[in-house]
Amino acid sequence: NEVKKIWLTASGGPFRNYSEDDMKKVTPELALNHPIWKMGAKITIDSATLMNKGIECIEAMRLFNLQSEKVDAVIHPKSQAHGMVLFCDGTMKMLLSSADMRLPSAAAIAWPNRLPLIESGFNFPPTAEWDLSFKKIDRKLFPCFRIAQEAGRLAGAYPSLLIGADEAAVKNFLK
């Protein structure tokens, strides 16, 4: 296999700089206040807990037929980089774009072509100052990510059970 590892990126959501004590005081209102993305309530909560990133890792494992140890995620607060692929020869490719949900949707709809969405695209010249800083996800601070990774590793019915449990947990949290 040419792919050695892939990383998805997460902004870290509203709690990326929280401590364990801060996390004990989280409310639905705080969780729904995402610093970058504008989304519906369910996906915003999943983004705040990084459950969405864990689920996306499972999706990547299934879509690209990769073992769980070859798929991970990192926090990238600027949301300029959306994924990286490390190849067996040591080279890496990275997808850069603005934080606009229309871009991945348009790419999926138009595949293998691309739609001209320059106004929402990445208007960031190569000579500008880039901030491509990344940090590991704290699995203690974001247990949903760790649980999703484990469900992906176990495979079978575990990912489906995870999705159902997440639906119920988010619904209960928002009450």
Name each model-derived stretch:
Residues 1-175:
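Catalytic, metal-anchored helix/loop core of enzyme active sites in primary metabolism
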